[in-house]
Amino acid sequence: MIYNYFSEPSNVLHFLEIFVGISLMISSIQHLKNINCFSNDGLLPWDLFKKNYRPPLISHGTFNQIFERKGMFFMNILRIILLPLFIMGNKELHLLTLFLITLLTIVIYVRSAIMCNAADQVNNIILTALLIHYLISDTPSNPSLIYFYASLLIISYFSSGLLKLHQVKWRNGIYLKQVMITRNYHHPRLIKILRAVNRKKFKYISQVIIFWQVTSFLMPLLPGMIFYFYLFMCLSFHLVTGFLLRLNSFIWTFTALLPCLIYLHEKIFACL
């Protein structure tokens, strides 16, 4: 049933928009909860310009106000207001809300990159590609966009696995154990349990994750049951990682792309 549902491009994109919308909603709520972390001076990382002065445009008062605490507050509030309109799929407002949400998301990301994770980067790519697609494509549910998203997800998995494969401490489980302990400071009992776990278990888990990620490029070519096993690995990885590391938007963003893999898999096997 799921396979048949996601064989339609419109269903895939609608699912993606809902999950990305939820991810952005959670991200904005997290920004509002941590709004006091932003100063009143505008926290754009000026050192990115590799200069000892701020360019005239950036030094302008209006520009700087966008990036200060009040600016961040109102941008996140505006994004929260726009997201339901975007998710509900109102045809008249869809393109306008998508444009505004994309613009807000990129500006918020630039302003608070230190608070962002891989999900925020992927959200930027998803929204930008979706906006370009709706602007230039004659058909709202063009499969080429779904193929792009499926490729994006596979590249994300594969590159992550390849980087881990080249790191000895990832292969032997040391980094995995360190990440699980240091990112769970809010769960003292869990930290105590994790510290007591034998490092060999982390080694095996780490190697399974690396193997799954490195071989992820084969997913669209795998037969039914093996393909669904890989999908289960993907979903489990995002759920467990998101829960343990408190990456709330991470769960929604990457899960949003899984139907794109299902669609790609279905189209490949339909041609065989």
Task: Report each predicted region and the residues it spans.
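Alpha-helical membrane-anchoring segments
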Residues: M1-L272
